[in-house]
Amino acid sequence: MAGARGYHTYRGRTPKGKIALAVVLVLIILASAVFIFIQQFVVYDASGTPHLQLPGSQTQQEEPEPDETEDVELTIDTPALTGVKLHALAQAPLTAADAQAALTAGGDGVVVTLKDSEGYVYYDSAMPQASASIQTQADTAAALSTLTGSEDCYTVARISCLLDPRAARADVEGMGLKNTGGYIFYDGNNLNWLDPSKSGTQEYLGGLVKECASMGFDEILLTDVSFPTEGKLNKIAYPGAGMQESIRAFLMAMDTALAAYPDVKLSVELPESVITLGQDETAGLVLSEIAPLVDRIYTETTEGSIPALEAAVEAVGEDTVLIPELTAIPAESDQPYLLTEPS
């Protein structure tokens, strides 16, 4: 049916307020889009203040890298050896009273004999070669722990090496220094020695060195490292490798024994004449071959001889230190020394 003539559907008029509202909404949407877009160009400085940085306007500043603290190498030094008194305890099994006396006697350290030139061992060694030669007191182990456990006391274990009548006679084939007849050699004092070239000698003494290091001693001082110099020396059956090479190989074996204890120093005691003359052919000692193998060289001397001895050692062992053994405190006592008698 057709609509009424002259009439159409009335839709009303569009108010101007609605148009304005639509425009505002469009502007808000555009503003939001622009805000979101430029967010990617907002940067913040070190203080947290925002800045607008458009593409191509300037090179983006690199963030400052945090300061890196320079690596510092920490070195822990053991107490300096500036005066060590040898007490009577050094030639006998250590007791608790001896240890306490040593700690209060002054100086910075103590030298304790753990094996003497008669072959006696003054601690409970696990080495089977020492089993018949051990001499201790009930409190020796505790006394040794007292010394090595003191942070203010530099401890040196003194070991007599090749002059050892007990071990030499107990195992002539494995360790003893023989005469040309195949029997144990007796020197001018009717004493017996170990052969430094024999593996049994190196194993035994190397084991003692390792045990002393494991007990906490800061340094191992080897004494009586030489061939005999008294008696019928022409009757000695010297090692085929030669005397000097045998001594050198022995010291290298002792150094190897300390491989697990890199902070423990290895030292040797030499006669003053070996340092001043450079060698002793009779004893098989050559300073230039010995000095590079040890950290310190001890020698009995007087204060006036120290400068010349230091120069001689330094000339053949750049890092080797001379430790003079004195009977009185020197006038210049800022250098290391060993006091062998109470002043």
Which residues fall in each region the model found?
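Aromatic-lined carbohydrate-recognition surfaces of secreted/lumenal glycan-active proteins
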Residues: 87, 154-163, 221-222, 243-284, ...
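N-terminal, intrinsically disordered, polar/charged segments of Gram-positive cell-envelope systems
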Residues: 41-83
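Active-site-adjacent "subsite" loops/lids of carbohydrate-active enzymes
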Residues: 76-89, 162-210
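Aromatic-lined substrate-binding rim segments of carbohydrate-active enzymes
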Residues: 100, 116-160, 208, 230-266
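Hydrophobic membrane-insertion alpha-helices, especially the h-region
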Residues: 21-37
